[in-house]
Design a protein with these regions (language model features):
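NAD(P)+-binding Rossmann beta1-loop-alpha1 motif at the extreme N-terminus of oxidoreductases
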Residues: 1-52, 56
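Structural motif
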Residues: 9, 32, 74, 89, ...
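Amphipathic alpha-helical segments at domain termini/boundaries
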Residues: 24, 31, 65-85, 166, ...
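NAD(P)-dependent Rossmann-like dehydrogenase/reductase catalytic/cofactor-binding core
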Residues: 27, 161-165, 172-183, 202-206, ...
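Rossmann-like NAD(P)-binding element
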Residues: 38, 52-113, 121
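Rossmann-fold dinucleotide-binding core
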Residues: 113-182, 187-191
Length: 291
């Protein structure tokens, strides 16, 4: 069974980005979110992002219109019953993801592939909560999905070869490059990236440099497109903390201990750009460092 229809659970930054690239590649897309306002906002975000692609000359307006016509809001999870591939793109919280799979599995066609966009959690462990561990796989898109070329494919211990092959063909059809990671905490990209961000936060916490000094040092000294603290705000500090906790718990190494300052910011609700405040304050016309 070829993949023709894709269901996406979660209409936030990642889910809407995945829907965006799937529709541009010609897939029928059903986008679901438990919150109706997030679903409405997600579809509006896709349309706005495609409109910017048209304005910049990267997309024809006819392509935007055709792609948007392929995206349908799914107000109920039951609307995903006929999809060939279901992708969970909810928050990086294992309890939330398990609950989604428990609700979704009885609805899906028995032959449908079930995927998670988790950036750190064990694929094998998540698969064990489903009725189809052999047709369960990690398809980890990078943020922002329309711009980033890489997708990590991660097999659980039970993932069969047909599921892997179909998933790889699907990702390739989206115009993305595939890298295959083994099922270890945080896979490849975040196993390397998040400890670097965590170390930057420790550098701030210990007073080695200010927010501006740290980000400038890494932009100009290491040729990074954005500084690690700015990147943390973009990712979301709650997501950064979740990934560091997965690394720390899964690998039992103190080098992955989340910085206390990161923990404090998350406890304060300072999650970065999405809440208006993190290592930068985004509530004015221009972002301003908070420390």
């Amino acid at each position: 069974m070829a993949i023709k229809t894709v269901g996406i659970v979660g209409a936030g930054q990642m889910g809407s980005g995945i829907a965006h690239v799937c529709a541009l590649a010609g897939y029928d897309v059903l986008l679901h979110d438990a919150a109706a306002d997030r679903l409405e906002k997600g579809i509006a975000t896709i349309n706005g992002n495609m409109a910017r692609q048209v304005s910049s000359g990267k997309l024809e307006d006819e392509q935007r219109s055709a792609a948007m016509s392929l995206i349908r809001p799914a107000n109920s999870m039951e609307d995903l019953a006929g999809v060939d591939l279901a992708i969970e793109a909810a928050t990086e919280d294992e309890t939330v993801k398990r609950k989604i799979f428990t609700q979704l599995c009885p609805i899906l066609n028995p032959q449908a592939i079930l995927a998670t966009n988790t950036s750190s959690i064990s694929i094998t462990r998540l698969a064990s909560t489903t009725d189809r561990p052999e047709r369960f796989i990690g398809i980890h898109f990078m943020n922002p999905v329309p711009l980033m070329k890489l997708v990590e494919l991660v097999r659980g211990i039970a993932t069969d070869e047909e599921t892997f092959r179909k998933s790889k063909d699907f990702v390739t059809a989206l115009g993305k490059s595939v890298t295959v990671a083994e099922d270890f905490p945080a896979f490849i990209v975040n196993r390397i990236l998040l400890p670097m961000i965590n170390e930057a936060i420790y550098t701030l916490y210990e007073g080695v440099g200010t927010v501006e000094a740290i980000d400038t040092a890494m932009r100009l000294g290491a040729n990074h497109p954005m500084g690690p603290l700015q990147l943390a705000d973009f990712i979301g500090l709650d997501t950064c903390l979740s990934i560091m906790q997965v690394l720390h718990d899964g690998l039992a190494d103190s080098k992955y201990r989340p910085c206390p300052l990161l923990v404090k910011y998350v406890e304060a609700g300072w999650l970065g750009r999405k809440t208006g405040r993190g290592f930068y304050d985004y509530r004015g016309e221009q972002p301003v460092p908070t420390r």
